[in-house]
């Protein structure tokens, strides 16, 4: 349904179908379909339609609720960071804080501390707790992973 130049109507229909038939696909297929929907939202957001940020967060929230993000029992670091960034841009501070607390232990052990501290620093910065943000950022090692 989502082609390179897909329409918002196609997107809405896809989301409607996914909600109506949640058990039709295996987890891996469902993850791929949601990734296409996410990418569509991101393209629309990048084209200047900021209303789609809330659509994207809804997609993320559904996948979180269904545990679709977990790969081999771990939450991918990039998805974790993207979800935090989007939630903060939408000023959904309480939800972001709950998300981080609930899922930070699901990050892979080799990335757990770094990714969690980076998200926490973002959260503190967004909530204007600048001293806390700086304190937490001191514990972040930046890599290009």
Predicted regions and their residues:
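Solenoid-like repeat scaffolds
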Residues: 19-30, 61-74, 101-112, 137-145
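"A position-specific structural signal for the A-helix of alpha-solenoid helical repeats
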Residues: 35-40, 78-82, 115-126
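Residue-level signature for tetratricopeptide repeat
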Residues: 4, 43-46, 85-89, 119, ...
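Alpha-solenoid helical repeat scaffolds
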Residues: 45-48, 68-81, 85-97, 112
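Hydrophobic/aromatic interaction determinants used to assemble and anchor large protein complexes
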Residues: 1-44, 63-64, 79
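Catalytic core segments in nucleotide and nucleic-acid processing enzymes
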Residues: 112-113, 118-145
């Amino acid at each position: 349904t989502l082609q390179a130049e897909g329409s918002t109507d196609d997107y809405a229909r896809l989301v409607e179908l996914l909600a109506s038939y949640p058990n039709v696909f295996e987890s891996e297929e469902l993850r791929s379909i949601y990734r296409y929907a996410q990418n569509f939202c991101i393209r629309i957001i990048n084209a200047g339609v900021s209303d789609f940020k809330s659509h994207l967060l809804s997609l993320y929230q559904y996948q979180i609720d269904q545990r679709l993000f977990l790969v081999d029992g771990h939450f991918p670091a990039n998805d974790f960071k993207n979800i935090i960034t989007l939630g903060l841009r939408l000023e959904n501070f309480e939800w972001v804080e709950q998300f981080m607390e609930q899922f930070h232990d699901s990050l892979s052990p080799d990335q757990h501390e770094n990714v969690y501290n980076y998200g926490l620093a973002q959260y503190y910065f967004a909530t204007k707790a600048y001293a806390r943000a700086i304190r937490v950022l001191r514990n972040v090692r930046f890599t290009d992973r």
